Amino acid sequence: MKFSPLLDELIQSLRCLPGVGPKSAQRMAFQLLERDRKAGLKLASALSSAMSDVGHCQSCRTYTEETLCPICASHKRGTSSTICVVETPADVLAIEAGGHFTGRYFVLLGHLSPLDGVGPEELGLALLERHLASGDVAELILATNPTVEGEATAHFIADMARRHKVMISRIAHGVPVGGELEYVDSTTLALSFNGRLPL
């Protein structure tokens, strides 16, 4: 059944969100129209502002509405000689939530995937190479995902960093804290054994 054209457009627009199918989009639209129009207007305003004003940091490529994100603009962290390379801005938030990393970031906005047409240019690796060539980077921490594409991306970047004589490290992969061995997949378990540390 078709509703009004505006309602149909709202439902179809909500479907662009990950994990939102036709029924979920319809429920969201009805919720906003029937019970929470004020929140709907606030959502529309925030979405409009974010779409027009949020761009990428000129240094690390994470999301910001300024030229530099707060980390790169910080006098303490923006001059750190340690850069952590991640695939997405969400990875930055995850690492920041841990509160243990005090350096700066470089966000790839993806990973190498030749079949999908994603090469070094799409990941901004020319900008990363400029950072490495500047002489201001002592260590590059590779925190790409432990997938085939993430590993290939990490190896490509490691080769680039070696040319600039920058120390390279890779975040550890293994058994999660609180995890039980019987539920850990064999690849993760192998990585845990290969990356074991002395006590």
From Swiss-Prot:
Keyword Zinc-finger found: yes
Covalent S-S links between cysteines: none
Keyword annotations from UniProtKB, A to Z: DNA damage, DNA recombination, DNA repair, Metal-binding, Zinc, Zinc-finger
GO terms under biological process: DNA recombination; DNA repair
InterPro entries xref list: DNA_Rcmb_RecR, Rcmb_RecR, Rcmb_RecR_Znf, TOPRIM_dom, TOPRIM_RecR
GO MF annotation list: DNA binding; zinc ion binding
SUPFAM superfamilies: Recombination protein RecR (SSF111304)
Superkingdom per UniProt: Bacteria
Domain Toprim: 81-176
KW DNA repair (keyword) present: yes
Zinc fingers typed C4-type, residue spans: 57-72
NCBIfam families: recR
Function text: May play a role in DNA repair. It seems to be involved in an RecBC-independent recombinational process of DNA repair. It may act with RecF and RecO.
Family named by the database record: Belongs to the RecR family.
Protein name: Recombination protein RecR
Lineage of origin: Bacteria, Pseudomonadati, Pseudomonadota, Gammaproteobacteria, Alteromonadales
